[in-house]
């Protein structure tokens, strides 16, 4: 089977990266079919989007159209995926705050707003290759055309519709959403995608098998070097609940057209589908919190996309553990089932963090995975701002690439962070700052933490230990502000994840 | 003479950079002695600071101490410079807003605050090689020790003091300031610097010759590839006024010790000395405005240093044009001499802009000089925030390096700029944005502007023209927001200057 052709090497976090296998070999894991959520079917195919679109140019080089055609004997990577819930699912979403929102983002946010707290969706259509961004009114119409077509195909009036579909009074016309990633400023090749939709929505094509999920994850990929998919399973009350997460990392979509005319674009897309019975409003709050400490805490190059979207679906199809007792309520809400919701929120958060790390690990040119933990700040927002400033500093990222325990650059970037206001005002106290490099968990060398700055005073550094610590692929930086101007009242912390800046990044991003 | 050994090639801005001479050959210009301000003397020498300091390590490699010793036949670059005014000069300063301010920054800001609006200085002592940052109370004491020593040497009670010195009742004990740049977290080698001071302050060593000024500019350099010095001369009323500016660009100070232990650091230092008669308070306002639109509008790598300092001195020694009419007031102030002050402010601003550009051109690994002009925003601060966001985007900087007219990345980075609030609120309107690449001034190819986005709609791009425009060393990006949500009321503009991101940057910053 395709997904088994990746060797799962049992990646050891503390092995020096230079000796490791490819990222695909290390980070693609076999999916246990029993951990996939119930009531979802997926399909994906190759629509030829990259070849269909041309950048807006006045000259067309003859070779441009054929550049991305794969070798005849090589199956092209799928670029369209459909995820269908057998019943209308509760839906939640978080979207880019970029002013220039792509058409699918505008469509989804408008649809969710119109649908209100009981919003339901039946399907998520995703394409890679074209972001449908900066495409104006035409872009919105293109998204709507495709969404309408999927809705019609999944409608119970369509005699070919998937048999498990159940009519639900709550479902509305907003029940298909779309996500796009790829080249911006170019119209979506609607005809190319449209002619795949009947195939994608056919009952014989929609599958619940791990192969189908992995292929869907591949359809999301742009310059990602591996498909990103993980599952979680847990017992909640009398239900065995599962979540599957797919995401894709920041990546250049048009590697052969990087010169003028090719509009490269990086986007974060993610979808989390669960069979837990959660209301839309509750799911939204769980997702907000999960994204706040996962996807909103990663950085590859500091550039926020026009298309960033994370969607979560909950269809309530989780099986009962004790079949004699099936009187679980239809949907859990925070007020009525706080324990269930809290446990679900923790599981979703944990999965979001794991999935966000995969994006950092697959960051363009990334050779290091760096965790920046800022402790004992005034507020979470202040700790987050400082961790973000450190994690996006080009100088820090170059130092990590060079395996240099450079506390000076860390301190400097912490010092110019733009701090959100708080009452009372909170400030960093230079004489209280500790910067320590921590050994990665489970490292075999039994290294001790390496303090480089204690109470604002530079420390004598054991060069041998520093060299060893920084040679790991995973670097853990601990910044303890000891409460700053609030003293013992300053106890907030935030964790950020970033990668290093390598020459490879410049090459990829030319 | 040393400064004439650089060929001044009459740099043509539109020549493709690949065919150009070195940056030193292109950007070091001969100084006309008659354009230097009156009443200033300078000296510089090699104190061996880089060799004197050792990073805080537990192991000392034998080779470390000798790494930076120059070839015996090669004169070492000076690393200490003294600029002395023959009379106490009005003083103004702008300093880094980084929380972790270096000792000389704390010393200077404290001294200027204590001295009040009539602050006067006699001398500026500058060293490169050691930033005296993150050195705590000891660092402050070290700065004070050196400042005290220079004061004693320049005191009229010292019989060797320079003969032109005139006692001034207004001068106070705060009349020597210091600037430092280099390695951080390491104590200043006070003894090494101190033993040079008598030499530096000796009347036979202090000079007003262009050679002496150029050597002082060299003393400021860290990884700068050329000394940065320019002059301005202009008639104000009955006075022929001059300004000389020296600055140094962001640079790694310890290229041989970039691995753990070496704490690399980038700093912007600048000094502007004029013989115009300007009061300290007025000089401060002129400097604030000049820095706001020059040094605060450049970016090399987006990292703000702990040592950034710009100082301005005005000693009132400008010669009279008409010697029969010498009744000019002692000092010009904004309220009493607005025309004089406005003209002076324009000259200072123009010089600051020129000097700030030299830093961008000498940016580490920089091969392109990029001007980002944002027009028709709500407020200056909003235009500045958008221009800054575009100029610090790694993706935009990579695109400029790759000579890619990538309006998508420009738009995207404009879209996530963190906008300062205004009343009423102002927002970007995606349907009004124009992005145009402009031909550099005086380019011989007579190229037309290249609109890539008009009213938010991507334009067909003439590939040949785009290729030509982007092949220039200087790239001009014009972003017209057409007033955004304020319509015709949105008329503010800001200009930012940045460089590209090259593989060379990663190499330098390892």
From Swiss-Prot, chains A, B:
Cite a GO CC annotation: mitochondrial matrix
Q: Which domain of life is it from?
A: Eukaryota
Q: What is the lineage of its organism?
A: Eukaryota, Fungi, Dikarya, Basidiomycota, Ustilaginomycotina
* The species this protein was found in: Malassezia globosa (strain ATCC MYA-4612 / CBS 7966)
PTM note says:
The alpha and beta chains are autoproteolytically processed from a single precursor protein within the mitochondrion.
Listed A to Z, the keywords are: Acyltransferase, Amino-acid biosynthesis, Arginine biosynthesis, Autocatalytic cleavage, Mitochondrion, Multifunctional enzyme, Transferase
Q: Where is the active site?
A: 267
The chemistry this enzyme catalyses reads:
N(2)-acetyl-L-ornithine + L-glutamate = N-acetyl-L-glutamate + L-ornithine; L-glutamate + acetyl-CoA = N-acetyl-L-glutamate + CoA + H(+)
- The protein here is known as Arginine biosynthesis bifunctional protein ArgJ, mitochondrial
* Residue ranges, compositional bias (Polar residues): 57-70
Q: Name one GO molecular function term.
A: L-glutamate N-acetyltransferase activity
Q: Where is this region: Disordered?
A: 57-76
User: What subcellular locations does the record give?
Assistant: Mitochondrion matrix
Residues carrying the site annotation Cleavage: 266-267
| Family in the record | Belongs to the ArgJ family.
């Amino acid at each position: 089977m395709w997904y088994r052709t990746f060797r799962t090497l049992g990646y050891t976090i503390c092995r020096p990266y230079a000796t490791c296998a490819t990222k695909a070999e290390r980070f693609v894991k076999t999916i246990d079919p029993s951990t996939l959520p119930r009531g979802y079917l997926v399909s994906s195919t190759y629509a030829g989007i990259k070849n269909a679109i041309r950048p807006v140019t006045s000259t067309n080089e003859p070779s441009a159209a054929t550049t991305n055609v794969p070798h005849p004997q090589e199956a092209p990577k799928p670029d369209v995926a459909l995820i269908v819930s057998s019943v209308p699912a509760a839906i939640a979403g978080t979207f880019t705050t970029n002013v220039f929102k792509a058409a699918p983002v505008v469509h989804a946010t408008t649809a969710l707003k119109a649908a209100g707290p009981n919003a339901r969706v039946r399907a998520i259509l995703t394409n890679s290759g074209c972001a449908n961004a900066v495409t104006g009114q035409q872009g919105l119409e293109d998204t709507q055309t495709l969404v309408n077509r999927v809705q019609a195909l999944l409608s119970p009036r369509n005699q070919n519709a998937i048999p498990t579909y159940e009519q639900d009074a709550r479902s509305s016309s907003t029940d298909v959403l779309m996500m796009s990633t790829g080249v911006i400023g170019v119209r979506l090749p609607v005809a190319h995608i449209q002619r795949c939709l009947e195939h994608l929505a056919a009952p014989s094509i929609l599958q619940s098998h791990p192969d189908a999920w992995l292929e869907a994850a591949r359809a999301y990929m742009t310059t990602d070097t591996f498909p990103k998919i993980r599952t979680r399973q847990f017992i909640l009350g009398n239900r065995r609940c599962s979540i599957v997460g797919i995401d894709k990392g920041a990546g250049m979509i048009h590697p052969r057209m990087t010169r003028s005319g090719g509009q490269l674009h990086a986007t974060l897309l993610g979808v989390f589908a669960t069979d837990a019975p959660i209301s839309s409003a509750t799911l939204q709050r769980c997702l907000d919190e999960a994204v706040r400490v996962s996807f909103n805490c990663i950085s590859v190059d500091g550039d926020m996309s026009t298309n960033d979207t994370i969607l979560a679906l909950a269809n309530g199809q989780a099986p009962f553990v004790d079949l004699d007792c099936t009187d679980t309520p239809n949907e859990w809400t925070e007020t009525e089932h706080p324990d269930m919701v809290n446990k679900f929120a923790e599981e979703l958060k944990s999965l979001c963090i794991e999935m966000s790390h995969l994006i950092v690990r697959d960051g363009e040119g990334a050779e290091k995975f760096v965790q920046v933990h800022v402790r004992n700040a005034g507020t979470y927002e202040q700790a987050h701002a400082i961790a973000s400033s450190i994690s996006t500093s080009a100088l820090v990222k170059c130092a990590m690439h060079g395996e240099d325990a450079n506390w000076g650059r860390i301190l400097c970037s912490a010092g110019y962070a733009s701090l959100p206001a708080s009452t009372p005002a909170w400030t960093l106290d230079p004489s209280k700052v500790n910067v320590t490099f921590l050994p990665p968990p489970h490292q075999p060398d039994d290294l001790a933490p390496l303090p480089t700055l204690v109470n604002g005073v530079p420390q004598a550094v054991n060069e041998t230990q520093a060299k060893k610590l920084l040679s790991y692929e995973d670097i853990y930086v601990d910044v303890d502000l000891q409460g700053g101007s609030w003293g013992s009242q300053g106890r907030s912390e935030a964790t950020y994840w970033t990668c290093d800046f390598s020459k490879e990044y410049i090459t990829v991003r030319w």
